[in-house]
Amino acid sequence: MVSLPQDRMRQLEKRFEIIESQMAKNPNAEIYVKLASEYAELQPIVSSIRALNALYGEITDLETIISDKLTDVEMRTLAQEELPLLCQKMEQLEQKLQILLLPKDVADEKSAIVEIRAGTGGSEAALFAGDLFRMYERYAASRNWKVEVVSLNEGEVGGYKEIIATISGRGVFSKLKFESGVHRVQRIPETETGGRIHTSAATVAVLPEAEEIDIEIRPEDIRIDTMRASGAGGQHVNTTDSAVRITHIPTGIMVVQAEKSQHQNRARALQILRARLFDIERQKAENERSASRKSQVGSGDRSERIRTYNFPQGRVTDHRINLTLYKLDRVLEGDLDELIHALISDHQTALLMEMDHHE
């Protein structure tokens, strides 16, 4: 039998009943929307709690029938046959509820900012950064998420030295947050005549997109500089100082945007800065909350080598969970579900172990 936090379950059920009652009173639209959002969040949890309590009652009734010496043989036999089936159903429901009751990452439902930077490997690394961006772009398309490039710096022979994009949709961050880290590629470059395998790398950073309500940026904490935006060969894109550099003085974080519109550059630079500051706060809170946890998947260390894409063998290996898939082509086409589900499952297991440890 799985250990479940009974007090918390009772509190959630009581809160759910209060929300139901308040929604029935037809308050104003703004209050109703907030209540409906909380209702939608609690509904699957409370439904599972109620189903489990009903199941406990059925199991108790069957156990009473089996232990009662006055029960006729046929009734006892039926109860003995049904009991293991209900116990199996109970275990499955307890495990489902255990996952539903896990601590939620406040950023999970948010959109994300994805930053991909070519690392070691020169032009090959830039090409690989391009492959990674297209992989995420296709994955996003399969889920009807919107992708918008914020800024890019193209490689000499293709791909990107750096590309930053927003991926908008519900729950984007929950699916992509484990992509942060160093991605390594092993393949034979087209220019390689000797057939030698080259190793290159690109770094991925996935940040939850932050709203103004999530993180406050005080005007006195930032310095905004404008400068000439230059195109290829150092030519000025236009005659105005359109590039914007924003420095967050307390942390030293610097964001540069160099598109043609100065107004748009300022807005986008603030958007990226807000996301980075929010991510720092989120990581700090996570570390304080679970200082004892050593989950590699959840660490988000961007210097950590997390995955290798081996072209000659057609395989992808995620080093954090020791998972190897021999479907490199499909993964690069955006078929990431198997990898992402395995990473989420591993993270949930680590959280469950942490909860057991605290209990």
UniProtKB/Swiss-Prot annotation:
Stretches the record annotates as Disordered: 284-308
Chain positions found as N5-methylglutamine: 235
Cytoplasm keyword on record: yes
Principal subcellular localization: cytoplasm
One function term, GO molecular function aspect: translation release factor activity, codon specific
Cysteine disulfide links: none
Range of residues in the leader sequence: none
Gene3D superfamilies associated with the record: 3.30.160.20, 3.30.70.1660, 6.10.140.1950
Family in the record: Belongs to the prokaryotic/mitochondrial release factor family.
Function in brief: Peptide chain release factor 1 directs the termination of translation in response to the peptide chain termination codons UAG and UAA.
The protein's name in its UniProt record: Peptide chain release factor 1
